[in-house]
């Protein structure tokens, strides 16, 4: 089949939305409920545009369409940002390495791609200031000749950005570099170069785009899948044309038609699946690639300084970045199959750890057990069907219009989602003869962007009695909407904080966020831990601890039965286990079949174990642990204790045998496992009990 393809590399015309234009666009003070959105999808006779896909690109297309006064609909078969858009490196960047290739190969297309991305970077930082910020990134230099080489490249990056350069790059001496990044490897270090890019909370950014779309009057619904495309015969040409989609509400199973003059395919890695609904025999254009990231404790990087390894052992680029008080490291680039549930592979996790160790000081031991979460995102790389080499990967994105009028936007990257959306709508308007004005999304504030200031968290503390850390978190997550979340917070019953019960003690997420998440179209517990909060991406164990309370809160609000609650809990745990690296973390215990502890270590750990196993049964249960903890004044509910023991209970018989405990301590000693709750609890209990033991006359030296 012949394809109409347009490759885009030119940056969009930058022109901010003026006040008069914004006044013309209707804006809803209250978000319609999901049920109201589904009703709108079913009752509207015909939309101008139906977008399939609720990631960054699809949501961006919907925002561009609705702000041009087009009657707009969007459906997403999972949750908004459930795919690639929530699994990025969290950078808003132009692409330093693309610029390097452009200069080295005199490639104008690469140069224009970087220029476009730098324009879009500036806009994205402006329209969602609460979710994004400039981040300095250090490029350490270990050979003298590399210093002028890298400096020239980074300066060119600044020059291409022009007036939208975030901050000017600069060179650091070895001493200053180590002062700013103390964990850096000192040996042979000659200095460093620091440049600036943007960083954001990707899933929340995606959600903010989608919520802004809803505010402007579009009908959008998550958990609504396309079963098949609708077609009708064009009376003028006699050809079949796409005129909508037959959809199914994944939650209720209800099916209905959504009719539209134009259908846009913005399904990322699933691009070809929807294209084949239109033309079954069409060749694939998507070549999926998996990118794995890991999260390790925040103390491995400075609070406000990232690190770039420009040349890994296999020629890739690795970023090492502070994010949400943790440290992200990644990414990999491996061909993969398209799946809705990508799993981070152990070899990719170990590759990233190996590269990180290469750049950090030898006395900073990065252990496998330090990995708190890991994920894999599928990049939807695309081929250009018009190219002579049909296997060559297109370095940017493509817009494709099929013979039946299905518009497909594929490829690209997070930073350029807005310009991609603008170009897609321009093509859709042209092909389908839609009546619409120019794009209005440059400078258009996203959900929460209005009324946000860097100091608004102080008002949250003063007006509501929230902890400072919680107030800062709410401000940086919800922006101007943070006050709505604070109003929903329950009284703690403590002197301070007055309101805001945390879901888990070490993270600033509070219970009212779960209730607010439902207003933001969260339908499952996974939506809350993965995309409304980011707990699942930061620490899988903490997310696992928070799940029972999250399910309880959602169940009460949504009227879930006990059976539904159990199913939700199980599904969310499965998500953590498979997609967020909990499986790999757990396997560090089971893989350590050979115990290599020394005899003194074995005796020490046996002694610790028997402080809980008073009857010398050879195993301990929640009752044993609860009894000891109560004795030293620590109270943990039985459900939480069951979860703690279950992490170590390898044969899943409801108890922890001595051998299982020794395997745990063996893994802890080798750095295979860290932050294990049972290990920490038992050590704390042992120390507390030892302090209480009476000192014998012999040990006191005799006398009275």
Features from the language model and the residues they span:
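Extreme N-terminal leader/targeting segments of oxidoreductases
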Residues: 2-49, 67-68
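Core beta-strand elements of the Rossmann-like FAD/NAD(P) dinucleotide-binding domain
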Residues: 45-47, 251-262
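N-terminal Rossmann-like FAD-binding beta1-loop-alpha1 element of flavoenzymes
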Residues: 47-74
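Short hydrophobic core segments
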Residues: 51-52, 258-268
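Glycine-rich FAD pyrophosphate-binding loop
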Residues: 66-88
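C-terminal accessory subdomains/tails of enzymes that are appended
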Residues: 78, 131, 138, 142-155, ...
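Glycine-rich active-site loop/strand segments that organize a redox cofactor
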Residues: 81-115
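A conserved short coil-to-beta-strand element within the FAD-binding core of flavoproteins
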Residues: 222-243
């Amino acid at each position: 089949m012949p394809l109409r393809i347009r490759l885009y590399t030119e940056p969009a015309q930058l022109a901010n939305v003026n006040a008069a234009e914004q006044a013309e666009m209707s804006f809803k003070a209250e978000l319609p409920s999901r049920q109201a959105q589904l009703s709108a999808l079913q009752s509207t006779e015909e939309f101008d545009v139906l977008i399939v896909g609720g990631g960054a690109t699809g949501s961006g297309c919907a925002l561009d369409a609705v702000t041009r006064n087009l009657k707009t609909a969007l459906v997403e078969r999972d949750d908004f940002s459930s795919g690639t858009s929530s699994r990025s490196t969290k950078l808003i960047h132009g692409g330093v390495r693309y610029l390097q290739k452009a200069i080295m190969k005199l490639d104008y297309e690469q140069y224009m791609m970087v220029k476009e991305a730098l324009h879009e970077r500036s806009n994205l930082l402006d329209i969602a200031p609460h979710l994004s910020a400039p981040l300095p990134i250090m490029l350490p230099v270990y050979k003298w000749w590399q210093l002028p080489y890298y400096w020239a490249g980074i300066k060119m990056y600044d020059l291409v950005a022009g007036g939208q350069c975030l901050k000017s790059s600069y060179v650091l001496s070895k001493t200053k570099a180590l002062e700013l990044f103390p964990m850096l490897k000192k040996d042979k270090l000659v200095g460093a170069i620091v440049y600036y890019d943007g960083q954001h909370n990707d899933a929340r950014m995606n959600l903010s785009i989608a919520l802004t779309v809803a505010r402007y009057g579009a009908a959008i619904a998550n958990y609504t899948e396309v079963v098949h495309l609708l077609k009708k015969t064009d009376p003028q040409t006699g050809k079949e044309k796409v005129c909508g989609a037959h959809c199914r509400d994944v939650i209720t199973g209800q099916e209905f038609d959504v009719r539209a003059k134009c259908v846009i395919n913005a399904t990322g890695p699933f691009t070809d699946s929807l294209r084949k609904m239109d033309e079954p025999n069409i060749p694939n254009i998507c070549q999926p690639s998996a990118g794995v990231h890991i999260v390790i404790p925040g103390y491995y990087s400075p609070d406000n300084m990232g690190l770039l390894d420009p040349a890994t052992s296999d020629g890739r680029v690795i970023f090492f970045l502070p994010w949400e008080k943790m440290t992200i490291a990644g990414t990999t680039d491996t061909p993969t199959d398209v799946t809705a549930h990508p799993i981070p592979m152990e070899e990719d996790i170990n590759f990233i750890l190996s590269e990180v160790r290469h750049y950090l000081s030898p006395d900073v031991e990065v252990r496998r057990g330090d990995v708190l979460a890991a994920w894999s995102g599928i990049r939807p790389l695309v081929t250009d069907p018009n190219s002579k080499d049909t296997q060559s990967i297109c370095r940017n994105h493509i817009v494709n219009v099929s013979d039946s009028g299905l518009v497909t936007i594929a490829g690209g990257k997070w930073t350029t989602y807005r310009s991609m959306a603008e170009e897609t709508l321009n093509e859709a308007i042209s092909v389908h003869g839609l009546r619409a004005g120019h794009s209005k999304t440059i400078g258009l504030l996203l959900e929460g962007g209005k009324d946000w200031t860097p100091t608004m968290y102080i008002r949250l503390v003063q007006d509501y009695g929230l902890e400072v850390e919680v107030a800062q978190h709410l401000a940086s997550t919800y922006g101007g909407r943070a006050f709505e979340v604070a109003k929903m917070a329950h009284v703690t019953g403590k002197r301070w904080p007055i309101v805001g019960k945390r879901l888990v003690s070490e993270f600033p997420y509070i219970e009212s966020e779960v209730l607010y998440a439902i207003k933001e179209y969260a339908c499952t517990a996974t939506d809350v831990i993965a995309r409304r909060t980011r707990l699942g991406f930061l620490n899988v164990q903490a997310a696992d601890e928070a799940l029972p309370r999250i399910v309880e809160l959602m169940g009460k609000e949504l009227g879930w039965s006990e059976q539904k609650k159990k199913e939700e809990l199980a599904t969310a745990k499965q998500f953590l286990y498979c997609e967020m690296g909990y499986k790999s973390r757990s396997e560090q215990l089971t893989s350590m079949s050979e115990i290599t502890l020394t005899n003194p270590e074995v005796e020490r750990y046996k002694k610790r174990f028997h402080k809980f196993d008073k009857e010398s049964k050879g195993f301990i249960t929640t009752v044993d642990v609860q009894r000891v903890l109560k004795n030293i004044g620590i109270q943990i509910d039985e459900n939480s204790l069951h979860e703690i023991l279950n992490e170590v209970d390898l044969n899943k018989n409801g108890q922890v045998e001595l051998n299982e405990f020794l395997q745990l301590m063996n893994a802890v000693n080798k750095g295979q496992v860290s932050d294990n709750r049972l290990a920490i609890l038992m050590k704390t209990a042992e120390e507390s009990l030892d302090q209480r033991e009476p000192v014998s006359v012999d040990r006191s030296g005799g006398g009275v």
